[in-house]
Amino acid sequence: MKRALQTVGLAVGLALLASAGFLSKSWAQETHIAREGSAWGEEVNGTLAGVKILRVKVDMGAVVVRGGQQQQGINYVAHIRFGNPSEQDARRQFDQYKITAYVKGDTAWIVGDWQGGRRQPRHCSSEFSVMVPREMTLVKLETDGGNVDASGVSGHVEAESGGGSIHFDDIGAGVNAETGGGSIEVGTVSGELGLHTGGGSIEVHHANGKVLAETGGGSVEIQSGAQGAIIETGGGSISVRHCNGKLKASTGGGGIDLGDIGGPVEIDTGGGTIKLTSAKGHVHAETGGGGIELYGVPSAQAETSAGGIVVKLVNTGGERRDSDLETGAGDITVYLASDVAVNVWASVDLANGHKITSEFPDIHVRSEGESYGPKSYTAEGKLNGGGPTLKVHTSTGDICFKHAH
């Protein structure tokens, strides 16, 4: 009778602790240890209540989260592997990596805590796999160095890694990702994206919200963005196939290749080439030394110290502003649609061997200087009655005005 009362008392006490949020271990947690080739592996699995928020925080290892439409609770499996020939040594290290799982309020926690000193074993790997209901409102994942992979969640997802890669797909709300140096890849995300890596590449397939992508030196590629983007890289290339809204792209030295942009564009590179297929708004493009090609834009400011410039001006229905095209040493070719109305002013400073040519009779070209001495070219005119100013200047190079077809 006394033992029965003690058992009942213990059960009631544990239940009270669990309800108060002080019970750390999951009730359904199980542990298995087995030989894995020359190493030893431990598998810890368990189940937690299907709450709306998940926090995973581990000292080492990868984290994988998958959302399921029919998933009710939260199921997790932690697999740890130590490269120890001795089972006794392996068990000692397994004991030093504490895995706890619990629910407190509306948040489920899964924690991997290395307690064996500041230095973790060299021959060690781990992965935490978590199955969650798709209707999670927030999933936050943190690892000191492993990869992070999350998909199939209707809410917001946040991930932080000390240096591993990060992958998101099929996320219903926004995402935030930060890694010390790994790559970041995003499939389809419905909300806003905030992506930061110390030096890895960033790739986004389809974003329905605004995109902020920053990397210390890797390349950035966006296939489709629905609401504009800000892209910054310390030196990698930038590629955007399609983006609605305003786009700002900046790199310390890589090339920038843009497709169809549904708003104004700001482009800046320390020395790479710039290419743009079309834009609905005004374009500002600047490079320290590469060529610039802007096709299908209403107006543009393009500047390079030593490259050629090609610009095609068309009426896109957007705001039209003054255009200014300038290079220190290179040719400039301007294609003008038949309905574009502009005031043209062009000049070539050192025109020996270079000149200004025009397919438009209303653009008048004249030269100054002797045939064998310093010579310069200028051109002025109004097309379709005039409009915003189109200023074109090169220190040494040809300038050509052509009909856009």
Q: How would you label these PLM feature ranges?
A:
Residues 1-405:
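Intrinsically disordered, low-complexity terminal regions
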